[in-house]
Amino acid sequence: MEFKHVPILLNECIENLNIRDGKIYVDCTVGGAGHSREIAKRIGNGKLICFDQDEDALKVAKQRLEEFGDKIIFIKDNFKNIKNDLHNLGIEKVDGILMDIGVSSYQIDEDSRGFSYMHDADLDMRMDQSNPISAKDIVNTYSKEDLENVIFKYSDEKWAKRIAEFICNARETKPINTTFELVEVIEKAIPKKVRMNQKGHSAKKTFQAIRIEVNKELDVLEQAVGDSIDLLNPEGRICIITFHSLEDKICKDIFRQRQKGCICPPEIPVCVCNHKPEIKIITRKPIEPSKEELEQNSRARSAKLRVAEKII
């Protein structure tokens, strides 16, 4: 299958990265290399470090960026390890970092990856195929309480308790091995009247929650955003595209925390901490896709871009 992934908010990312000749940039999720290609065109004799934990994505990215030669360094790893991986390359500071969070169009559309409730496939959902834990493991081994917690926490699915109960009941008869088997259980758990009137697919929220749990996406994001800010040179920028409220909240909260000056307790009348703001937030409100982009790519509809600049 052809690796298709249309870069979202491409112009907005390139503009806000403030790319300069000869500097070092990082694409934490190279995917189909749409963003990386535009960055590489603008760095002159600089360097671009491209991360991805998905072997398929890296193969495609290497082909699509081949013309840029040794300007590009590829790293097969989860971007939560950005600080250590760059250190191993002898790089302690960089000038811009891009994160495009979440699952790629290729991963959704490739049946064998098991991300989609629209294609029947083995229940997988691993972004990194070397990850020992798949969606099948979670669905068939987590307790009812743990399943309910995962589904509600990561998707705000109000039928989480009932879905967890139905999953546990179904797997007593036989394991739930495929995406369509899981969809069938979810649809039985949600009352028909509700399903008939709700927007979107009945399984969408549960699949999102399980995918986040499989890949520990929110833990990874929290670690990576904090470390990325540490890695930036003064005037370096971090651009983060998120696709749901949990991701966006993590980024917003970390940006606000790192923008703070004094962190003394309120009862202390005079600052003694000497804490200085580390960043300034460039996007007071997140940038969202234009009407024109949404007409061309409906998968961009929930995207939000937040940008911050290192000041010390």
Curated annotation (Swiss-Prot):
One of its GO terms (biological process) is rRNA base methylation. GO terms for cellular component: cytoplasm. SUPFAM superfamilies: Putative methyltransferase TM0872, insert domain, S-adenosyl-L-methionine-dependent methyltransferases. Keywords: Cytoplasm, Methyltransferase, rRNA processing, S-adenosyl-L-methionine, Transferase. GO terms for molecular function: rRNA (cytosine-N4-)-methyltransferase activity. S-adenosyl-L-methionine binds at residues 33-35, 52, 79, 100, 107. It catalyses: cytidine(1402) in 16S rRNA + S-adenosyl-L-methionine = N(4)-methylcytidine(1402) in 16S rRNA + S-adenosyl-L-homocysteine + H(+). Its main location: cytoplasm. It is found in: Cytoplasm. InterPro entries: RsmH, SAM-dep_MeTrfase_MraW_recog, SAM-dependent_MTases_sf. Coiled coil: none annotated. Gene3D superfamilies: Putative methyltransferase TM0872, insert domain, Vaccinia Virus protein VP39. Its EC number is 2.1.1.199. Pfam families: Methyltransf_5. Specifically methylates the N4 position of cytidine in position 1402 (C1402) of 16S rRNA. Belongs to the methyltransferase superfamily. RsmH family. HAMAP family: 16SrRNA_methyltr_H. This is Ribosomal RNA small subunit methyltransferase H.
